[in-house]
UniProtKB/Swiss-Prot annotation:
Positions of C4-type zinc fingers: 52-74
Any one annotated GO CC term: acetyl-CoA carboxylase complex
Stated role: Component of the acetyl coenzyme A carboxylase (ACC) complex. Biotin carboxylase (BC) catalyzes the carboxylation of biotin on its carrier protein (BCCP) and then the CO(2) group is transferred by the transcarboxylase to acetyl-CoA to form malonyl-CoA.
Pfam families: Carboxyl_trans (PF01039), Zn_ribbon_ACC (PF17848)
Organism of this sequence: Desulfitobacterium hafniense (strain Y51)
Compartments it resides in: Cytoplasm
Molecular functions per Gene Ontology: acetyl-CoA carboxylase activity; ATP binding; carboxyl- or carbamoyltransferase activity; zinc ion binding
Descriptive protein name: Acetyl-coenzyme A carboxylase carboxyl transferase subunit beta
Pathway: Lipid metabolism; malonyl-CoA biosynthesis; malonyl-CoA from acetyl-CoA: step 1/1
GO BP term (any one): malonyl-CoA biosynthetic process
PANTHER family per record: ACETYL-COENZYME A CARBOXYLASE CARBOXYL TRANSFERASE SUBUNIT BETA, CHLOROPLASTIC
UniProt gene name: accD
Amino acid sequence: MLKDIFRKKRKYATLSSLPPKNSEGGLAYFDEPSPEQESTRKELPDGLWVKCPKCGEALFNKDLVENQRVCLTCSYHFRIPARERLEHLVDPGSFAEWDRELQTTNPLSFPDYEEKLAEAYQKSDVSESVLTGQASIEGMPVVLAFNEGNFMMGSMGSVTGEKITRAIERAIELRCPVIIFSTSGGARMQEGILSLYQMAKTSAALGRLAEEGLLYISVLTDPTFGGVTASYASLGDIHIAEPGALIGFTGPRVIKQTMRKELPEGAQTAEFNQSHGQIDCVVERAEMRKVLGRLLRYHQEGAV
């Protein structure tokens, strides 16, 4: 036929565009999944895998948690809940929590604040955005405070400031060093000026700690911003940060919107802050206990 004469002859091998047929003559790739296969799919729990935002690697969530939430491929430091951090840091069974009964109210009758607090209680296992208490690290007593990022982004309200201040005052009574792990978006807007008071309150308490000659180590984690950066996070005798932690007063997006300027790439990272003298050292999470233990030994009362 004429169409066969003018048809272009292929000089290369080709594959059929149709999938192979199954034993019953149907198209194998278009078969519906069996009930057993469908059941298996539905039984897979949510959150089984986590994608690393830095390297893109798919990580088994259980392995990630066991590795202190540090990527096994590129060492990216994920954010970690306060109690998980605590378990990896202190001597087993040594932590005694303080002031768990303190809870936030709504002193300014801010709209929807109670609902946001209720959500925060459900998302975390702390009563406020900070966990405080006493423990030991490598056998040395220490007073600790951990911001909880899952509780309203670790924001500082009245109860947060009160718990940190009480912890510092007890450290003075006990003659113990203080370590605070900061993770916060800043002062809590729902409490207005009452939240801003906490900057002065915690700073004054740390001033009394310094007058007593007691050590304060500030550990800045991702993210540390706003009123927390402008108060207790920046008042340490020694400042440590985790790798890649974002540290500053205002985020780059807000700076761009208000100042019409863009920050240099990486300008608010822990490494940038260290290179400009704001941070003394950047420490991997897996090494944090060992480094803190060494610093506590160096600064023990009576040590040479």
